[in-house]
Amino acid sequence: MKHIILLISFMTFTFNISFAQDDNQRITDEKSGKEILIGTVTRAGLEEIGGWFATEYQQYQPDTSDIALLKNFQSDFPFIFIVLGTWCGDSHEQVPRFFKILDQLQYPSEKVFMVALDRDKKAKDFCIGDYDIKLVPTFIITNQGEETGRIIETPTETLERDLLNILRGSAPAPR
């Protein structure tokens, strides 16, 4: 039953994407007074806001042996759903690192979907409640429409190792 609900949720989410007004919508964060992104976002949108993306992306060096092993599993994770907050320090750190891993895997960008939340864990025009998001960033890995694992907030080991463990079926339960 859980798998059916997840599949329906992803289908609904995909349907909403088709009719979404705009990616990379900006609002002012009430706490910091800075601009943040909300709703569906793209990598380009993340790269434009705040300057943190490029710095973390350039500094991160994924483990090459884990990257080599991940290349064997690429067909096993056809869809990656990332829920983040552009106001969140963990998102500033982990999301660029995740993209560095995906780039080294030459992973197609159309297989990655991102939603940015505000501090109340809400996204404009999207019901995020179906995904049980408590912390950001949350990386949801799916296989054939079913969730196979999550990396929540920060990895247990490294992003690439946690992703590898999810694909091997040996990942620890999410926190």
Describe the residue ranges of each PLM region:
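Conserved helix-turn-beta segment immediately C-terminal to the redox Cys motif
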Residues: 71-79, 97-115
